[in-house]
Design a protein with these regions (language model features):
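Small-residue-centered hinge/linker elements
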Residues: 5, 19-219, 224-232, 246, ...
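Amphipathic alpha-helical substructures
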Residues: 220-241, 246, 482-501
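Extracytoplasmic/periplasmic copper-protein system
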Residues: 250
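Bacterial N-terminal signal peptides
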Residues: 11-21
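Bacterial N-terminal signal peptides that target proteins for export
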Residues: 2-13
Length: 501
């Protein structure tokens, strides 16, 4: 079925209604019929992103809507007094749990304005059901399904595999609960890492259960039954266990809602995001393409404004990268520091929001960004908003702001350091590679790949990493005074809900 079928259905319904009104002239003394309820349609056609992709034009496509775009659409619906209800249609738009939580707050805002909200999708997984728990009604496409098994996480430990390949992960961690290196150095999790991850999953699971129990009016027994029977449910089973409200074929959705609003007709309106100007680019002109590729983004406001700076991806030294065709994007310390300097000195910028969605990365890059953030904070307010994650270096940056706001399901913390090298001497032997190293200077050989560290060398590395850890911890103490590092540092992870406590 075409993705714009519902829009055509809306247009056809409006035309039919107009034709009927023109065909019959009402008597002069008759009372005009009440206007039909207005229903706003908001379609989320792909997974929202944190920030626009500057390379989208290269593939002939518009921008994916950002999460902020979608929240803006929902807020527009909430503010429009002519709207009686909102239909949110998810079209091949899998969400993260945190995205569902942020969009859910915007849905709650719509409902608080006195409007009903209906969620429609061809199928539902756990995050989409969590989003639906904020709505008045969850509608499933007839013949569709829902999957609600709970939470599951699987880790792979590669120490034996690396040994078989002749590779030794020579890694050092500072922080008993850090554990980011254990996949390479162990065959099973350490007790500390196991405790860390289990506590995180317990928190996420508790948040999930609380939201579903509240939104779907289920008690503990009912929720357990929904997971037992609804782990892979057809529409009938999903409705029986209470994780959806109705199963409706898309062409019948308007009639279904007419019943819900006690109306014989509905006035449909579309609320759509700006898809960007990718279509305006002349792809037949190589000069136009290269000019667009290397064009600097405009960041200079012409009126008083609050600036938003995205830390989205791994934190790296130097310039930010978009990731190209195969790589992952990286947030560069040089790029972000330059942006922060411009915001610091721009009198029209009255405050700065740092939006973080990052697992961390380079400690040096994180420190450089932290320093730039503190310089801004000395002159104007700085707040941090956390998306899915602000862990390790991401949290390092966050503590440079005055306040940190996170979702209940956001992941924060991981105050610790991991580093080292991969020693490939055994692999070289298997492949009959002969490596010859030539060093100048007493410590130059420390980073060679052909030999592991001695205990003395490893101790030297550990001392330098401990210095990095101590600096990280001092930044946390300065930014979060009163925080007990004995119970929060050492690499521990927290949900947003637990981090507030």
């Amino acid at each position: 079925m075409s993705g714009r079928f519902l829009r055509r259905l809306i247009t056809a319904a409006a035309a039919t209604s107009l034709g009927a009104s023109l065909a019959v002239a009402a008597p002069a003394d008759s009372v005009a019929p009440a206007a039909p309820p207005t229903i706003a349609l908001i379609e989320i056609e792909e997974t929202p992103v944190e920030r626009p992709n500057p390379l989208a034009w290269l593939f002939g496509s518009g921008q994916n809507p950002t999460l902020r775009d979608i929240v803006g659409l929902l807020n527009r619906a909430a503010a429009d007094s002519s709207i009686s209800g909102v239909v949110i249609r998810l079209r091949e738009a899998p969400l993260s749990v945190t995205q569902a939580e942020e969009l859910g707050r915007a849905i709650a805002h719509i409902r608080a304005s006195g409007k009903k909200v209906h969620l429609f999708a061809d199928s539902y997984a756990t995050p989409e059901l969590l989003l639906g728990a904020h709505a008045d009604e969850i509608v499933l496409q007839a013949g569709g399904g829902a999957s609600f098994p709970g939470l599951y996480m699987e880790e792979m430990f590669l120490a034996d595999t690396l040994e078989w390949a002749g590779i030794k992960a020579d890694l050092v961690q500072v922080g008993s609960y850090k554990g980011a290196n254990e996949a390479m150095t162990r065959t099973s999790p350490s007790p500390e890492w196991d405790q860390n991850i289990n506590a995180l999953l317990d928190g996420l699971y508790a948040n999930m259960r609380s939201r579903l129990k509240s939104g779907r009016k289920l008690d503990d027994a009912g929720l357990d039954e929904a997971m037992r029977r609804g782990w892979m449910a057809d529409a009938s089973t999903a409705q029986q266990v209470g994780i959806i409200d109705a199963a409706v074929d898309l062409p019948d959705l308007s009639a279904h809602l007419e019943s819900a609003y006690s109306a014989t007709d509905l006035n449909w309106v579309n609320i759509e995001p700006d898809q960007g100007d990718a279509a305006d680019l002349d792809r037949s002109d190589p000069l136009s393409i290269f000019a667009e590729l290397f064009q600097e983004p405009e960041i200079y406001p012409d009126r008083d404004t609050i600036a938003i700076v995205h830390i989205d991806g791994a934190i790296i030294d130097g310039e930010s990268t978009q990731g190209g065709f195969f790589g992952e994007p990286g947030v560069g310390s040089t790029t972000i520091r330059q942006i922060l300097e411009e915001l610091e000195n721009d009198d029209l910028v009255k405050g700065v929001i740092i939006r973080i969605n990052s697992p961390g990365g380079s400690a040096t890059a994180s420190e450089i960004i932290w320093q730039g953030l503190r310089r801004v904070a000395e002159r104007k307010p700085v707040w941090t908003s956390v998306g899915n994650m602000a862990a390790s270096g991401g949290y390092y940056i966050a503590v440079g702001s005055s306040r940190i706001y996170a979702n209940e399901s956001s992941i924060l913390g991981s105050i610790g350091v991991v580093g080292g090298k991969m020693s490939t001497a055994g692999l070289y032997d298997k492949l009959k590679i002969r490596s010859v190293g030539r060093a100048r200077g007493p410590m130059a050989h420390l980073l060679e790949s052909s030999t592991p560290w001695t205990e003395t060398e490893r101790d030297l590395v550990r001392v330098k990493m401990k210095e990095t850890y101590d600096l990280f911890a001092s930044r946390v103490s300065a930014g979060r005074p009163g925080m007990d590092l004995a119970t929060t540092a050492e690499g521990r992870l927290f949900t947003g809900a637990a981090a507030v406590d």
